[in-house]
């Protein structure tokens, strides 16, 4: 029996050695306090592995064989309802029979209480079979978990301190419907002319005299927009002056809008209209819909004006999920390419033994392993941060060890998750396009036909740098955080640069010296951007009295004006930051597990010249273009329309 888990040594490394499952199980099981939960990390890991084995088999046996048919059948609108093809229905039904839609939900809500990291591993496995199936599947349990998270955050979930179980949660009925596999949901953000610039959203949330909320407006490109439960971002406050707290993002709120009501007689009353399903280049089996709301009854999530805050709860995990989705797609493309190259003979030997093709295959394999290391680490820290925060808030009688975890580990997990998540989303999405494109190239002319599956994977990959926050948005976020951190702690940055340079010549391990050289190049590029930004800022103060300099240099920073060079080079910088982060993670693995040294060496062989080239571009180019566009430059996209923030789609 085929299995996408058993045939993947690198993936299994993370179940054998590469993840601190004991720590993750401890926070997932509320410190092993619950009566019906696991009592040790080892006991939990047995279950986690069984789930991965099951999903690996389902992906190989139930999903992958249907991928081509799913792509051909697509979806269509019929009588106002979206209809999926028989192959898509069969694949999703197999996942529902395995009850995977309830994998991460708490047991008291009918779930299996598994870690999010395990869920993301299943995303990778399913995506390797078909990304459309993975996408549809994710809007079951993913939306149910969002309901729990939102309820916890707004204070409408209560915990029993004695049993460490949820005693009440706001959306219990909807969650139960999803657990039974009878409903799913969507996240409705994008509108015509309002994608990354969320301050331009026009959908409205209005409250009547009785306190009831209603949503009106149109949303487009809504993945799983045919689902029942729509989390909708809508404007509840009119945009005012730039210093108005309700201007821009501050005027957005989040609502839960049921899209329809099924009557006892079997008929359905539509509340939200599905106007059309998009004719997409790829992902033919999944739904991207345009939906409209005409005073649709809605439930406010949290308080008015908190929509962006609640959206980020979903978005961070969604971006990690896209990272794993991309890895599954890359895995499928690499295996297709290798299988074809090993059987296709040219000039007396398989093309897999031709030097350039061998180089392509080696790079693809190395990139996939590197991406998985980045994805697993980002997911681990994001989940640890979320669950430690929950324990700190709700756990009764925290032990001394738990109190130490709250004080020491929680900030560390948050920092690492914030650093790694945009790097993962950027690198995984860009590599998905690169690897699927290379797979098609290795196939040659037949790859350009529908007789072979290479073209489908490329079509499926092309959306990855666009959705859940474009690659350019990830680059701007990483740049803002990186340079902002230097401006806040310049002394710590100088020390870090000095230490990297010292280790690059003094470390006993040759691989550690190489990683340190990579770090030094990254820090040098950052230093250049900060130095140039600061110098330009000082020059702009020529007409400002000296007594006003302190305020200008500490508070009056406008990314549209002051960070022009950094914004120009943001994508080059994030590529350096991603190469650096992967090298650091692989060095950690190689130090603990010597069998990973080969992977680190392969990564460095490719990353070092790449980073040197990017460093050269950052430190020597950009002035000509900035001089040309500065006089009439349009305002840069902003999440709020005000200085100091960068958008997230």
Pin down the residues of each PLM region:
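Extended, charge-enriched "interface" segments that sit outside catalytic cores
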Residues: 1-78, 82, 645, 649
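Alpha-helix capping/hinge segments and adjacent helical runs
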Residues: 2-5, 10, 17-19, 283, ...
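Internal helix-loop-helix
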Residues: 56, 88-172, 176, 223-225, ...
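C-terminal amphipathic alpha-helical interaction region
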Residues: 140, 503-649
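A structural-propensity feature for long, helix-poor, extended segments
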Residues: 151-158, 170-174, 476-526
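A short core secondary-structure module
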Residues: 212, 216-269
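A glycine-rich, basic-preceded beta-loop-alpha segment at the flavin cofactor/substrate interface
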Residues: 261-275, 280, 287-318, 335-352, ...
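C-terminal helix-coil-helix/basic helical segment that borders enzyme active sites and/or dimer interfaces
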Residues: 369-425, 560-564, 587, 591
